[in-house]
Amino acid sequence: MFKKSSQLFSLVFFTIFSIFIGTASAIDLDEATRTVVVDSSGKTIVLTPEQVKRGKRLFNATCGACHVGGVTKTNPNVGLDPEALSLATPRRDNIAGLVDFLKNPTTYDGLESIAEVHPSIKSADIYPRMRSVTDEDLTAMAGHILLQPKIVTEKWGGGKIYY
């Protein structure tokens, strides 16, 4: 009886806690936070609240299993934090760079294709979740990746010390 009561209490507490203390929703983010770099020229765009919500949902469903908290499970040395993205070749710290990677992934130095081992549009036959992903979806997912350092700060891509 005690076990059932404690589980019920935990469930109720978690629900109430998540309602009041939950993560920032797209509507809560101001325009400055939703502003991301589009390409290597430095041009910026402001993501709509819908793009932010969609990007989070798609990232969690498609990428979240291997990139929890911006860390790469298969290679913890290369994360999705701003520094790692900016040091990649070509740079992945903008929407165009991330969309390009999601279409045709390459190694960190950009020399070899990794489409057979990393989900992408190019390897949609191997990774079914990528089959129905559109360019708008890719833009939303890239926007989510670029927004996270602004929302969760250094925790995004920070690794084991935070998660």
UniProtKB/Swiss-Prot annotation:
<keyword id="KW-0408">Iron</keyword>
<dbReference type="InterPro" id="IPR009056">
    <property type="entry name" value="Cyt_c-like_dom"/>
</dbReference>
<feature type="binding site" description="covalent">
    <location>
        <position position="63"/>
    </location>
    <ligand>
        <name>heme c</name>
    </ligand>
</feature>
<keyword id="KW-0793">Thylakoid</keyword>
<feature type="binding site" description="axial binding residue">
    <location>
        <position position="130"/>
    </location>
    <ligand>
        <name>heme c</name>
    </ligand>
</feature>
<dbReference type="InterPro" id="IPR017851">
    <property type="entry name" value="PsbV_cyt_c550"/>
</dbReference>
<protein>
    <recommendedName>
        <fullName>Photosystem II extrinsic protein V</fullName>
    </recommendedName>
</protein>
<comment type="subunit">
    <text>PSII is composed of 1 copy each of membrane proteins PsbA, PsbB, PsbC, PsbD, PsbE, PsbF, PsbH, PsbI, PsbJ, PsbK, PsbL, PsbM, PsbT, PsbY, PsbZ, Psb30/Ycf12, at least 3 peripheral proteins of the oxygen-evolving complex and a large number of cofactors. It forms dimeric complexes.</text>
</comment>
<keyword id="KW-0602">Photosynthesis</keyword>
<comment type="function">
    <text>One of the extrinsic, lumenal subunits of photosystem II (PSII). PSII is a light-driven water plastoquinone oxidoreductase, using light energy to abstract electrons from H(2)O, generating a proton gradient subsequently used for ATP formation. The extrinsic proteins stabilize the structure of photosystem II oxygen-evolving complex (OEC), the ion environment of oxygen evolution and protect the OEC against heat-induced inactivation.</text>
</comment>
<keyword id="KW-0732">Signal</keyword>
<keyword id="KW-0472">Membrane</keyword>
<feature type="binding site" description="covalent">
    <location>
        <position position="66"/>
    </location>
    <ligand>
        <name>heme c</name>
    </ligand>
</feature>
<dbReference type="GO" id="GO:0009535">
    <property type="term" value="C:chloroplast thylakoid membrane"/>
</dbReference>
<keyword id="KW-0934">Plastid</keyword>
<dbReference type="GO" id="GO:0009523">
    <property type="term" value="C:photosystem II"/>
</dbReference>
<dbReference type="GO" id="GO:0005506">
    <property type="term" value="F:iron ion binding"/>
</dbReference>
<keyword id="KW-0479">Metal-binding</keyword>
<keyword id="KW-0150">Chloroplast</keyword>
<comment type="similarity">
    <text>Belongs to the cytochrome c family. PsbV subfamily.</text>
</comment>
<dbReference type="Pfam" id="PF14495">
    <property type="entry name" value="Cytochrom_C550"/>
</dbReference>
<dbReference type="GO" id="GO:0019684">
    <property type="term" value="P:photosynthesis, light reaction"/>
</dbReference>
<keyword id="KW-0813">Transport</keyword>
<keyword id="KW-0249">Electron transport</keyword>
<feature type="binding site" description="axial binding residue">
    <location>
        <position position="67"/>
    </location>
    <ligand>
        <name>heme c</name>
    </ligand>
</feature>
<keyword id="KW-0349">Heme</keyword>
<dbReference type="GO" id="GO:0020037">
    <property type="term" value="F:heme binding"/>
</dbReference>
<dbReference type="InterPro" id="IPR016003">
    <property type="entry name" value="PsbV_cyt_c550-like"/>
</dbReference>
<dbReference type="GO" id="GO:0022904">
    <property type="term" value="P:respiratory electron transport chain"/>
</dbReference>
<dbReference type="InterPro" id="IPR029490">
    <property type="entry name" value="Cytochrom_C550"/>
</dbReference>
<feature type="signal peptide">
    <location>
        <begin position="1"/>
        <end position="26"/>
    </location>
</feature>
<dbReference type="GO" id="GO:0009055">
    <property type="term" value="F:electron transfer activity"/>
</dbReference>
<dbReference type="InterPro" id="IPR036909">
    <property type="entry name" value="Cyt_c-like_dom_sf"/>
</dbReference>
<keyword id="KW-0604">Photosystem II</keyword>
